[in-house]
């Protein structure tokens, strides 16, 4: 198996831990940054990506029967990255909430493909091993990205959203999957 394919699949596994992560270290600051916001608005920032991820995981699974998996993956990655950009540019609470919904959509398209690509490219014991590595990468990313977003939140509340640019790496690697 070419290393570029492994790196591509592993990079997608890393993304499973990221949705909603950047908001966590700044939740306590949101009522100060946006004093007109309700507690419900602030809670939506952390819960909306997960709420929308669920139906889009189901939709993505169904779409893989009719649409090229790599195209679907790249669409999800683009939505994910655009979410990061829009978060960085947001100046109003309603914008952050709308972007949270967009992030959930992008994430939902990607999540089933991380394990789906393992099923597609690996068999037997090697497939089982890749599932284990995928899980480990997801958890390592969760810990690392949590530390990074916490550090960045101390500098500026917009900076934790930089983690939503990580899918650019996965997008570049996904280009190698097109020809296989």
Question: Which residues does each PLM region occupy?
Answer:
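Extracytoplasmic
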Residues: 5-36
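Helix-breaking motifs and short loop linkers at transmembrane-helix boundaries and internal kinks
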Residues: 36, 68, 89-94, 123
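Cytoplasmic helix-loop-helix junction between adjacent transmembrane helices
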Residues: 101-136
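Conserved small/polar residues in nucleotide/adenosyl-binding loops
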Residues: 178-180
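Residue-level signature of mid-helix packing/kink "hotspots" within the transmembrane helices
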Residues: 21, 50-58, 142-143
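Conserved MFS/SLC helix-loop-helix module at the cytosolic interface between two early adjacent transmembrane helices
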Residues: 55-91
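Helix-loop-helix hairpin linking two adjacent transmembrane segments in secondary transporters
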Residues: 133-176
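Paired small-residue
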Residues: 83, 94-102
């Amino acid at each position: 198996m070419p290393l570029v394919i492994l790196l591509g699949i592993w990079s997608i596994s890393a993304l499973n831990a990221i949705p909603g992560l950047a908001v966590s270290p700044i939740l306590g600051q949101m009522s100060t940054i946006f004093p007109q916001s309700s507690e419900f608005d602030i809670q939506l920032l952390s819960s909306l990506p997960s709420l929308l991820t669920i139906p889009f995981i189901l939709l993505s699974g169904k779409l893989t029967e009719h649409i090229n998996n790599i195209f679907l993956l790249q669409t999800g990655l683009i939505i994910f990255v655009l979410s990061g950009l829009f978060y960085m540019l947001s100046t109003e609470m309603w914008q952050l909430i709308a972007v949270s919904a967009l992030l959930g959509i992008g994430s939902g398209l990607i999540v089933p493909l991380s394990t789906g690509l393992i099923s597609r490219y690996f068999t037997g014991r090697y497939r089982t091993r890749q599932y284990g590595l995928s899980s480990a990468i997801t958890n390592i990313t969760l810990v690392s990205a949590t530390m990074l977003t916490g550090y960045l939140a101390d500098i500026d509340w917009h900076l934790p959203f930089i983690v939503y640019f990580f899918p650019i790496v996965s997008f570049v690697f996904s280009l190698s999957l097109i020809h296989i």
